[in-house]
Amino acid sequence: MHRSLVLALLGTVSLSTALEAREIFVSNEKGNSITVIDGTSLEVKATIPVGNRPRGIVMSPDGKFLYICASDDDTIQIMDTSTHEIVGTLPSGPDPELMDISPDGTMMYIANEDDNMVTVVDLVSRQPLSEIPVGVEPEGVGVSRDGKWVVNTSETTNMAHFIDTDTHEITDNVLVDQRPRYAFWTADDAEIWVSSEIGGTVSVIDNATRQIKHKISFEIPGVPKEAIQAVGVRVDKERKKAFVALGPANRIAVVDAQTFEVEKYLLVGQRVWQLAFSPDERFLYTTNGVSNDISVIDVDSLEVVKSVPVGPYPWGVAVKD
């Protein structure tokens, strides 16, 4: 009896510690800051000054570092997630907007919007390895789960570029709709979901054929077509449901990831931009740029359960477990 009680208490302590450790990081584009939110209480813990115009942010696989695109400083800042202090920088090209990290945490791929390049940085040495010429105004970057491929989207060229991570060369170009913003690999590496902001669509690309297998469009009663702008994308690990941020439409589209049918639209804050799951995928967090908040969505019930005020013009979001 005593041993069972001790084990139960230890389990409770471990669970509590894990919950307390979860933090949500939000980049505030016009606030030049990162807002840190407690993942359990959903209260703001800190607002941390960073570089100019922070946009894309990504968490290291081990959760120790948050990487921040300080776009107007032409650099990537490194934040220690335990101290919330900036501890270093990484080289990039001009106007870095989004980046992604290899699954083993050793390589970073950065889209530099103003020089039409993807910069490859070794995260161990913190030195650049190469610059890869891509299309005009590169934006989205997504690394495959096996680390063998990077997909970069170029906004003006309207293409998704497949880059071999061994050779750093483009092997395939896939034409998508106007102004592609984001590239998301499914957990099994079978598909890449590419959002097109002005096109208002998501192209689902088959990784085996490098062809578009389906194109998802969105229609919201009472919302002008030009306001429906697809931006951030997330697909759950089991490839059952997908979520698409629709920008000025102020909606998240819920999509059946098998049939590609839109099931529902969730009303969130104004100009919803980027998305991130909680590690257990029970919650989805959205950045709402014009209303200066994030929305918290219960993934099971498909309901918005809370709005959390953050800094001016929230852009990116990342979660530490």
Region annotations inferred by a language model:
Residues 4, 11, 17-321:
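Predominantly soluble domains enriched in secretory-pathway, periplasmic, or organellar proteins
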